[in-house]
């Protein structure tokens, strides 16, 4: 039987594609070695003998890992020989990677295959508890796990950050473009988490005092989290609190959302003010204790409150009358009644 020309052409193209793909893989592997040689990239392990109580990392472009382990070590892969420095000065372990001297093609190159120069990686293993750990990274992911520190500070420009199983007195994390995860950790003092563009996830974490969150563009989700009080500000993105518990009954909390929804589920909040311009506010089996306000510009309110009707005094600023100041738990809902609908139910 005579084979059709289009079948022959298809098989030929498939065969040619396979050859090109194999060639690309080989070329990529060669590129990896070529770039390492041309850029003087090295692998290096350091174990400074001097004692230190703080760690300072200033990295331009690398994947950074700081982890707990039984033995102190610093390992680096694919770092420029003349731009990578490790030293102990003034009781501080200093790790620096400066990419100013690297040519543009150390980050990308032209070609038909998707291979790039080898990525720099720095891994720091810390066996003890330290006074302060500060990490600054221009471009690259950052993972911090299992360490014990008094003050932890993370500042990223481009990349995702994960902080897991960490014990700290205070935590500050600032990420310009990338996601931020905080999980399975204990912060006895204040946790300040700020993002410009990215999603924030906090789960299975205890925060002793203030939980401060700011996000310009991205969603924020806190699950199984406790804190003393809260201060959260979102410009564009939704806020979801699930099994979220505030423990300080004397402090006030503030939630400000410009464009996004707020949803609370199985949570407990004290003396909270919610200010939403564009978005809906809803709760499921959530306790709003103390004096609370919900200010809406454009959006609806659906409250399912934990407890009985008699546990709360719910009022509306656009309705006749006012709240009884002697009531234990007050909720004042304000907004334009022509654009805001409010419903309130109870679990008992």
Predicted regions and their residues:
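Intrinsically disordered, low-complexity terminal regions
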Residues: 1-348
């Amino acid at each position: 039987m005579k084979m059709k020309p289009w079948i022959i052409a298809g098989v030929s193209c498939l065969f040619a594609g396979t050859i090109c793909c194999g060639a690309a893989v080989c070329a990529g592997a060669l590129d990896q070695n070529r770039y390492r040689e041309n850029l003087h990239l090295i692998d290096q392990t350091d174990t400074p003998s001097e004692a230190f109580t703080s760690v300072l990392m200033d990295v331009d472009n690398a994947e950074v890992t700081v982890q707990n382990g039984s033995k102190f070590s610093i390992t680096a892969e694919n770092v420029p020989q003349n731009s990578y420095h490790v030293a102990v000065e003034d009781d501080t372990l200093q790790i620096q990677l400066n990419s100013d001297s690297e040519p543009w093609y150390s980050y990308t190159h032209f070609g038909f295959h998707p291979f790039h120069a080898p990525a720099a990686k720095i891994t720091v293993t810390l066996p003890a508890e330290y006074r302060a750990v500060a990490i600054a990274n221009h471009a690259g992911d950052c993972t911090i796990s299992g360490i014990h520190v008094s003050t932890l500070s993370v500042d990223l420009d481009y990349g995702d950050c994960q902080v897991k199983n960490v014990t700290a007195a205070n935590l500050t994390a600032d990420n310009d473009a990338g996601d931020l995860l905080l999980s399975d950790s204990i912060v006895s003092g204040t946790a300040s988490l700020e993002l410009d563009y990215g999603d924030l996830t906090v789960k299975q974490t205890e925060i002793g005092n203030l939980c401060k969150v700011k996000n310009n563009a991205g969603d924020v989700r806190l699950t199984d989290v406790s804190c003393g009080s809260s201060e959260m500000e979102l410009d564009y993105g939704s806020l979801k609190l699930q099994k979220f518990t505030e423990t300080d009954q004397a402090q006030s909390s503030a939630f400000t959302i410009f464009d996004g929804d707020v949803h609370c589920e199985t949570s407990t909040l004290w003396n909270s003010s919610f200010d939403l311009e564009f978005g809906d506010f809803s709760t499921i089996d959530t306790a709003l204790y103390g004096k609370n306000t919900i200010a809406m510009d454009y959006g609806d309110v659906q409250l399912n409150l934990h407890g009985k009707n008699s546990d709360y005094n719910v009022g509306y600023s656009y309705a006749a009358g006012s709240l009884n100041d002697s009531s234990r738990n007050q909720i004042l809902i304000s907004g334009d009644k022509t654009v805001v609908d409010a419903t309130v139910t109870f679990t008992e």
